[in-house]
UniProtKB/Swiss-Prot annotation:
The gene is speH. This is S-adenosylmethionine decarboxylase proenzyme. Belongs to the prokaryotic AdoMetDC family. Type 1 subfamily. Heterotetramer of two alpha and two beta chains arranged as a dimer of alpha/beta heterodimers. It catalyses: S-adenosyl-L-methionine + H(+) = S-adenosyl 3-(methylsulfanyl)propylamine + CO2. Keywords: Autocatalytic cleavage, Decarboxylase, Lyase, Polyamine biosynthesis, Pyruvate, S-adenosyl-L-methionine, Schiff base, Spermidine biosynthesis, Zymogen.
Amino acid sequence: MKQLGKHIILELWGCENQALDDQPGIEKMLVDAVKACGATLICVKTHKFSPQGVTGVAVLSESHISIHTWPELRYAAMDVFTCGEHVTPHDTIPEIQKFLKPEKIDVMDIKRGIIEVDEVKE
């Protein structure tokens, strides 16, 4: 069996309100998370909502990291999806924790693109 991608979904509860509404800080966190997992950054795009909240995505050569925040609930939802053997999505978590300071994190692991090895055309 071969796995084409590794995908983690993060549920981040009890985060710092100010961090969840800090668009430049979230952009920096995304860049730091990309570096931490060994991925290749293509670009970062974020949007600040009124009155609060930020959504953002780091587009990677290997896929993406995304975030959507609810400061009023102290909650953030994140996806880290990577392809390739050299990238480790779980390595993003310390950078995310350092910035958002969640009280609780739920991590769901998804193996993407499971195929039989003999199906892979080299």
